[in-house]
């Protein structure tokens, strides 16, 4: 995808339509590019600039000050996220950058009330707490989302193939039993695979996958006809 307004809107609709219309608590998509915060490089660059007299130019006669490409890329992404949130104001749908990594930025589109309901269910809350997440108190949901983002960034720093922590499935509204069975079976021996790997109630899961596909198809068609993100949130999708 391209980092422009239209491209970002299309990505939201392509990957997050079920959340836009309210049948899924959250969706996640990746924006390709290097969005990692290169602290050492930035620090070194700032030290070099501080040692250089104002207005000093290099041997070529050009200014030696350089813009960090990842910083510019992050600024552009932040502007697009802010624009999307303005478009979605009053709809109960929020957009935020979940994690900034060298292999791409993960953008979370979510409905706070639906997501809080999912994560505060007794079994999910107990499991999340055992994994180090806040599950109660003022601001617990935003704290949990921020904690997930840090884990995703740290995993990518430690390994280029760091993968996703298992609790991502709970944030995305996957059935609790399927998330835990995925962990137990190490991703093997599933009944079917769609948005997630299914270990129980295959019929219900397949119906859900089909509904998500219809939702995405209809939302993409409406976007193509000029509908706004806010207008898509009022759509209804047959069960």
What does each of the following model-derived ranges do?
Residues 1-36:
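Short, extreme N-terminal leader segments that mark the start of a protein/domain
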Residues 73-140:
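A glycine-rich, hydrophobic loop/mini-helix early in the fold
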